[in-house]
Amino acid sequence: ELSKLQERAQRGMQTDVTGIYQRIWNGAMPGMISGKYTNRETFYSSYLQSYIERDVSDMVERIDKLGFLDFIRAAACRCGQLLNIHDIASDVGCSADTAKRWLGILEKSDVIFYLRPYSNNLLKRTIKTPKLYFFDTGLVAYLTKYSSPEILVNGAINGAILENYAVAEIRKSYTNAGMDCLMHYYRDRDSKEVDVVIEADGEL
């Protein structure tokens, strides 16, 4: 598997729009990028089944497995967006408290992460809500039922999933280098926005 990864890195990847969305659609889970699994649908279906049956069940004694799968899908539809717990809960038909618990499970098991808003005492008009991201965009594309990169690039979430991909890659690059990454986003009430703000050594 390592040799396949090295060969892939040496070949390089396309950097045009088609190539980027191919990477987004494929995702970055080891089983996919190593070439061990050749059928993407089978891989992600198996991954989700194993994740819910094993990992989630280890964290909570009882859970509505089908409801939880629907919940992950509803969250995936909102990747790269401001977190709205009530909207996700409404889509799935669960309470806001249940939605908060299930988001906690997804965060604890490294399926999702949040970008907190950047703020200081001089910035009074900033939005306070975090933004929701998935670590793997291939999972997002699978959950939202995009059957190819070509369809995804013209889909309703094309901008949001591209942002998700960029933010996740930045975060993973810091993690892989063993570095802390203080990442934020900035948005004020006039809708002025910076997608990523990185704080290091007291500077932005």
Predicted regions span which residues?
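Accessory nucleic acid-recognition modules appended to NTPase machines
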Residues: 33-203
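Amphipathic alpha-helical "lid/sensor" segments that cap RecA-like P-loop NTPase cores
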Residues: 4-49
